[in-house]
Every structure is written in structure tokens, then in C-alpha cells.
Amino acid sequence: MSKAFREAFPTLKLEEELEGLLDTTEVTKISANHEHTHIRIYLRAKRLIFKKNIWKLEKAITEQIFQNRAIQVKIIESYELSEQYTPKSLIEVYKDSILDELNAYSVLEYNLLRTADMEFPEEDRLILTMDETIIAKTRTDEIIEFLEKVICERCGMNLKIFPQYRKPQESKYRKNSEEQIGRAHV
């Protein structure tokens, strides 16, 4: 049984920008763990809400609704986006938010995705090209799983992701240290 966000949280005071984003948002479910220390709020929105705004919303709910209680609020968002969105246009618009979310989870995976190239040879195919490093090869599956969770599950789109690797560009720091090591052996 869904409720409009404002019906579910009528007393919540939010910034004007955030308020506007929630006009077409529904709360589809609220659940808690057995101890009532963690609450999950499931949202369904017709417009994208960037992760930083989701975090602001979690904070506002925690501070205003559950003040003075040790309760962690987690919002699980999903989207019903218009046909104007394709996986490519979604990534163009939502990439910073995707990176913010990944950065909160893993700085290592964030840096790999941030420096990766994304190419769409077809509307539902993404070629994700990363530097050929041991770290990239061991973390590729996690990055793909994360992207699929966001694009396919959260946003309801079909996308197949294919990894590929490129020879890493030599950094000036690596080159300088190799030259210094070479001079030390002469």
C-alpha cells in the first residue's frame, strides 16, 4: 500500500529543492529490524533524486522523526523514469551520483569507475574500459554488479555491461622512480 511521501511524513521539514523532488515520490514500504534500530524506507519516484539528496533526506528523517533515539534510517529508492531515458542518457545525467554512492562504499572501486571509459555501441550495451591492472581485474565484477544494481534494478532499465582493458598510461611518478632506480644501479 503506497502513500505519497508527504502523507507518510507530514511533519518533516525539508529544503525547498528537496521538497520539490519529492512531489511525485511515493513511500511503498517501511520496515524495521527486530530491535527497531534500523529502519528502511522504500521510495518510488518518477524523477531522479541524486544520492546526496537521498542522504540529506535520511538525515532529516533521523533528526526530526527519530530524534534522541539510536535509529539508523536507510532509504531504498527506485524509479519509474520516462521513456526519454536510455541507459546512456541516464549515465550522463546520473554519473556523479553513481560515483558519490560508489565512493561511500569503496574508494578503490570509485577511482576505477571514475577513470573508466564508457561506450554504448548499442542502446542496451555498455563497454566499460578500465586500465589493465591487477586491482581493476579483481574489482571489475563488483563494479559491474554495482552498475547493474543502479541502472537495472533501481531504474528499471535493461543493460548488459562488458568489461575490457586498456594499457595503462605511464604516470610521471612511476617513470621518475624507475629512472632514479636505474641511476642508483649505475
Describe the role of every protein-language-model region:
Residues 1-183:
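Intrinsically disordered, low-complexity basic tails and flexible linkers associated
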